């Protein structure tokens, strides 16, 4: 079924399909990884080109990598077609070294998906989607007004890897709507934010509304006490 790059092996807990990724196409590898690394947070990135034209596009190869300094990482591929031409977002970040990550909730989901259309370079996706923006505090790139939260970023570095790249951005400011902030921490009221995540396949997403549950985390001292009580 999968040819020479995959085979089944029996282990103590059942049958396992093993894939040799050195023999798997990029598309097949993509299908496997996005199905396993899920759900993924969505970075709805706004950026400007050198002429000041706004671009917006979503990316789910995204997460935070550290807090001192605060670093986020985004994997950005190339535009469809032959050659290695980075997507508008990657080109804009490299040119201006600034971008904004906007958090996507259920209310913004359809507009976010619309902005993923492969429009010609220089197209303002947010204008077409009738999504308003507001000025950022430290970067020239505007942020999405309706986003529950936004992260102003400056490019820390970009790592070119094969036909794609990983952009490391340093977060220099965070904007969060009042209703999603608990001032005691400050903490994010994540249960009320209703963020969405990306799953496998085109158009496949997951809601976080009503999906939270708690698993008590045991300390080493708790574990020692529990073990002593069992004896």
Kindly give the residue locations of the regions a language model identified.
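Basic, polyanion-binding surface patches
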Residues: 12-231
């Amino acid at each position: 079924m999968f040819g020479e790059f995959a085979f089944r092996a029996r282990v103590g807990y059942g049958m396992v399909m093993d894939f040799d990724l050195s023999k798997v196409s990029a598309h097949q590898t993509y299908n496997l990884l996005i199905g396993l690394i899920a759900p993924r947070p969505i970075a709805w990135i706004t950026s400007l080109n050198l002429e000041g034209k706004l671009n917006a596009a979503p990316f789910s190869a995204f997460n935070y990598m550290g807090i001192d300094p605060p670093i986020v990482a985004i994997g950005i591929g190339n535009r469809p077609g032959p050659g290695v031409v980075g997507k508008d977002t990657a080109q804009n970040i490299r040119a201006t070294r600034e971008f904004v990550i906007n958090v996507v909730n259920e209310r913004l989901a359809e507009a976010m998906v619309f902005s993923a259309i492969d429009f010609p370079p220089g197209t303002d996706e947010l204008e077409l989607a009738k999504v308003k923006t507001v000025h950022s505090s430290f970067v020239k790139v505007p942020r999405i007004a309706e986003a529950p939260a936004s992260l102003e970023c400056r490019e820390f570095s970009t790592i070119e890897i094969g036909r794609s790249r990983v952009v490391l951005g340093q977060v220099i400011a965070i904007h969060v709507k009042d209703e999603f902030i608990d001032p005691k921490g400050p903490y994010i009221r994540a249960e009320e934010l209703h963020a969405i995540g990306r799953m496998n396949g085109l158009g496949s997403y997951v809601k976080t509304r009503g999906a939270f549950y708690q698993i008590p985390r045991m300390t080493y001292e708790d574990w020692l006490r529990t073990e002593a009580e069992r004896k």
